[in-house]
């Protein structure tokens, strides 16, 4: 386990780690969506795309993973690290689990639909950062 990450967390009994991973991926998917929407709106407002991709990932409010995803967006190269279709699966599992536990996940449900539509457009086997390509309409 140590070679896979910087820190190994003991979450609890069997299955709790998978549950935690599902939660983290739901947060990751939603963070990718807001990052992409922010870049796209900034461009529509006349801000330079390279400026946005250089500055936003370094803001205190940005998730650290956006630095790597910014480069994918810049190069329009979505070589898979974590497939969009797997992100959709994790969002589906998270929203299903939320339903079963009577806990609404309004934004995760919306994210699930966006990732499903991107998958239908043929982006499923690309990295989940390809959601940017879907939101941009360049397919």
Question: Model-found features: residue ranges?
Answer:
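Helical "substrate-binding/catalytic lid" subdomain
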Residues: 16-138
